[in-house]
Amino acid sequence: MTLFCEQVPYPRLAEAFGTPLYVYSQSALTEAFEHYQTAFAALNPLVCYAVKANGNLSIIKHFASLGSGFDIVSGGELARVLAAGGDAAKTIFSGVGKSEAEIEFALNAGVKCFNMESIPEIDRIQKVAARLGKTAPVSLRINPDVDAKTHPYISTGLKANKFGIAYADALEAYHYAAQQPNLKIIGIDCHIGSQLTDLSPLVEACERILILVDALAAEGIVLEHLDLGGGVGIVYQDENVPDLGAYAQAVQKLIGTRRLKLILEPGRSLVGNAGSLLTRVEFVKYGEEKNFVMVDAAMNDLMRPALYDAYHHIEAVETKDIATLTANIVGPICETGDFLGKDRTIACEEGDLLLIRSAGAYGASMASNYNARNRAAEVLVDGNEYRLIRRRETLEQQMANELACLQAEHQNAV
């Protein structure tokens, strides 16, 4: 048996583009986006794809074609949205450290809203907007102090986290923002974490934020939208992920008759299970205490296992009638932490292709050049067709900015 992405066998993609190779299913991207649209249809939401999950231009372009808005956290991500044909007027600018240059870029581009996360940021956006003679549409990201029950590195809604304005300080912060002449308050935002597998924290956060919405309205600050962020998890192994329909019903019931536009910022749940990392076995190494399957992908290609001790299902692309072994699936990087899977039972040998599942989110977007390794190519599959959406990086491209400096030094010395 051979594994396929849609109607294309993975070995054909490996032959055409080499490995390691990120492979994405266009139909899976579409299905995930439409799942949100259908589940929340009664609330007519603006679904803003979180670009940080995977910023490939072709993926952004595809979501734009479906009517998606975008959630960005940097000027670079905004540039990607614009380059891919995304609509700035449907783009939310989040993030705790927006520079003046990024704010100016976003104001000139006409983003829908800035999610402000601190008093100093309120001051900075006011300053830049005044200098440009513009009015900045803003909301405040409020930290509801709700435990997302996820990995601590991706929990963002507790008092101890760097994100957002403390719940107890929210009313005061809104009144301060309302006094700024170049800011227009249009919404409220929260985002409590990523890879949530329990619905209750999401509902609790919504409840707490709506209490603030009512308190603000009573004091004359009437909001136009409610941004509940993202965070809905996906299945990597055996997780029970929240049902979007149940989530939508809970949110609809909580919003009730309030006239609030709902904004959602999903990332992982749109792209995570739409992508896989295709890799080839270099060696099988048998040891006294541990066996190792050495592959040509590594932690620089997929950081999640090393960073979060995250699980990704790994399987052989072609079924063979050979003995299985239990081994760690590891890359060639000089780190003991360079692993893609631990203690996996698999049947493979040198030259075989392996598929690392659920790698569409925080895979390519977190890749690096550690050990001077080139970043992987990326392919998008649509039915029986496929196309390259990112060329494999070359050593010349990897070293270009440094070589230019060396050449300039040489010219100056001469």
From Swiss-Prot:
Amino acids binding substrate: R268, R304, Y308, E335, Y362
Enzyme Commission identifier(s): 4.1.1.20
List of residues binding pyridoxal 5'-phosphate: G231, E265, P266, G267, R268, Y362
Disulfide bonds: none
Superkingdom classification of source: Bacteria
N6-(pyridoxal phosphate)lysine PTM positions: K52
InterPro entries assigned: Ala_racemase/Decarboxylase_C, DAP_deCOOHase_LysA, De-COase2_C, De-COase2_CS, De-COase2_N, Orn/DAP/Arg_de-COase, PLP-binding_barrel
Keyword Protease listed: no
UniProt cross-references to Pfam families, sorted A to Z: Orn_Arg_deC_N, Orn_DAP_Arg_deC
Cofactor(s) listed: pyridoxal 5'-phosphate
Database matches in SUPFAM superfamilies: Alanine racemase C-terminal domain-like, PLP-binding barrel
GO molecular function: diaminopimelate decarboxylase activity; pyridoxal phosphate binding
UniProt keyword list: Amino-acid biosynthesis, Decarboxylase, Lyase, Lysine biosynthesis, Pyridoxal phosphate
Catalytic activity line of the entry: meso-2,6-diaminopimelate + H(+) = L-lysine + CO2
Enzyme class: lyase
Active-site residues per Swiss-Prot or TrEMBL entry: C334
Biological or metabolic pathway of the protein: Amino-acid biosynthesis; L-lysine biosynthesis via DAP pathway; L-lysine from DL-2,6-diaminopimelate: step 1/1
Protein family: Belongs to the Orn/Lys/Arg decarboxylase class-II family. LysA subfamily.
Quaternary structure (record): Homodimer.
Function, in words: Specifically catalyzes the decarboxylation of meso-diaminopimelate (meso-DAP) to L-lysine.
Name of the protein: Diaminopimelate decarboxylase
Organism taxonomic ancestry: Bacteria, Pseudomonadati, Pseudomonadota, Betaproteobacteria, Neisseriales
